[in-house]
Amino acid sequence: MRFIALVFLVGALAIIAVECNSEGDALNAFKMNMLDPNNALQSWDPTLVNPCTWLHVTCNIQNSVTRVDLGGANLSGILTPQLGVLYNLQYLQVENNSISGAIPRELRNLTNLLSLGLENNKLSGTIPSSLGNLKSLRWMRLNSNRLSGEIPISVLKLVLWGNLQLMNVSDNKLAGTVPLANKTGFAITTIVQDMKA
């Protein structure tokens, strides 16, 4: 019986270690695609067992990444698709940088995400319809970028789930309109979009 318990414990620890390593690998891929003149990512050492000791990273008691806070860190580069493996991430805050390129579709995997802070960067392309998968999301800040096209219906439908409280898409190159009224009855939702002439 002790042998079975020991095998189970070793197996559970191995699963946790693999998850932490994949999260560290994902964050390291992000780091490798960033210019970091202020060394905000200097503590991000991929040789460590997990990223929970890195600055700007917060983990839960299972040593899984729940928060990445890099607002105003003077970073430039692209958001990497590997961020989509941070399955327990609740806060992705990379606002007020010079991050460019497209918003990765792989962020759809972050189903525990509460806050997506991508504002005041240089992101371009369209808002991925896959962000409509983020049904736990409460705050989505995409304002002050170079995003174009229409807001996908799947993203607008996040209002229907009653969790999304703020979606700021102002100061972009978006087309189309969004409904002004909240028809859910569950949440006070603010959608901020540039006024069209």
From Swiss-Prot:
Pfam families noted in UniProt: LRR_8, LRRNT_2
Gene Ontology terms describing biological process: defense response to fungus
UniProt repeat feature LRR, residue ranges: 86-110, 111-134, 136-158, 161-188
UniProtKB keywords: Cytoplasm, Leucine-rich repeat, Repeat, Signal
Subcellular location: Cytoplasm
One Gene Ontology term, aspect cellular component: cytoplasm
Induction: Strongly up-regulated by pathogen infection. Up-regulated by high salt and wounding. Not induced by ethephon, ethylene, abscisic acid, salicylic acid or methyl jasmonate.
Annotated TM spans: none
Presence of keyword Transmembrane: no
SUPFAM superfamilies: L domain-like
Tissue: Expressed in phloem tissues of leaves, stems and green fruits during pathogen infection.
Range of residues in the leader sequence: 1-20
Function: Involved in biotic and abiotic stress response, but not in systemic acquired resistance (SAR). Acts as a negative regulator of HIR1-mediated cell death responses. Acts as a positive regulator of cell death induction by PR10 by promoting its phosphorylation and its ribonuclease activity.
Quaternary structure, from the entry: Interacts (via LRR domain) with HIR1. Interacts with PR10.
Designated name of the protein: Leucine-rich repeat protein 1
Organism: Capsicum annuum
Phylogenetic lineage: Eukaryota, Viridiplantae, Streptophyta, Embryophyta, Tracheophyta
Annotated gene: LRR1
